[in-house]
Amino acid sequence: MKRFSYDEQRTILDECKSKGEALSVALVSDSRSYEDLVYSDEVDDSVLKSLPDFMPVDKRRSVANGVPCVSFFSGAGGLDIGFECAGFRTIADVEIVPMFCDTLRKNGHRVIVGPPYAAGDMSRPDEVIAELEKIGIPKDFPGVFHGGPPCQSFSIAANQRFNKNGENFKRTGFNHAKLGNLLFCYIDVILHFRPEVFLIENVDGLLTIDGGVQSAHACELLRNAGYDVTNPRVVNAADYGVPQKRMRTIIVGSRIGHFDYPETRPQLPVGSVFKTPIDGLPNHQTREHSAESVSRYMILGYGKRDKLGRVDRLDPFKPSKTIIAGGTGGGGRSHLHPFIPRTMSVRECARIQTFPDSYQFTGPVARQFTQCGNAVPPVLAYEMACAIHKSIYAKCKSHGENRQVKVSYKPPKVCEQMLLAVERKEVELSAAQKDKGWRGKVYSEKTTRR
């Protein structure tokens, strides 16, 4: 069925407002869905065809030959995906959040130092070290450690969501009771196992908080331990093939070579990721909007903000604004779709974050947004992984042997049964959702409706 004309859409929205009828009900009764809605500046398919193509991360060239990695603060697995697509091999993940662990397992990760088998608490590095040694991670680790300690205490964007009079408004940085010291806990683990290469990822605020003293001290500790630590650099993910503006701090060190940052690439417009249909993919539920909200959204121009809902329409001809996590306690948030006057689904945000379409997020929809928005874009991780291989491993022929690390990991029987029960439930829920069909399917939560 053809999408609404602008006048048809105005009519149905006005009727909903006058009758007090939910827009979703009116759309279903007319055999329509939110996908049929249009902006006032509706564009035809020729606009999409004119945009450059985007190459998914899982279709890119593999360069490394199975160099082993251990992932810390793994989250939803963005760094893992990028390194694996570049040819590295993840042999263990360390993660404290149960839902993130569920997502990792859902996507094939089986060796996870985290709930329900272990705490995965990096604020207790001695316990993490003991767990990793138990499964066979050796000292002088012949591979890569990578991770991004939680960044909320260093983030400017995170604190803009809080009331200025609240204690969360200021960037507490290294003074944060729970999150501020995790960088140094991670360094403790690095210094114990002495991997050949390490990568630290964080927000750009890491280099400016406390006048840069703490980040400089972190680099000094690693250099004193014999690592060649490249000067930390703030990079824009949009300069490395990610169709999104996202500023991140990258620190790489090696005891077997010198790391060179990858060359930048031409920026991709966000419209490129919408050239391929998304219908039928996992995590693609759209939020329920009122007729009043859609009436406001549909008159927005490219890149403009709806001040009442505090959401922005993406400009399809430019990189996306930063995909955000939406907080840990409130509802998940996303920007407005560039071509449809509604907020984006988790899958659409994941496309912009450069996750493969096959990658699945677990948990409530709001928490899926959290996982997606917190993640390192896999394409950015891929570019850094390729640069590590090119500048270090490809030049170190003498280090090309004995990189096979075998991990021995057998979770307790009771935990194995719990995991199987969870997986069965997820399969049943997924099948039930598929029976309903996708078009017109929405979710509604009081904390997220706009």
Predicted regions and their residues:
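Acidic-residue sensor for enzyme active/binding pockets
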Residues: 95, 201, 348
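Class I S-adenosyl-L-methionine
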Residues: 130-144, 152, 156-316
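C-terminal target-recognition/interaction regions appended to catalytic cores
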Residues: 1-43, 47, 55-60, 287-450
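Proline-centered helix-kink/hinge sites
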Residues: 149-150, 195, 243, 356, ...
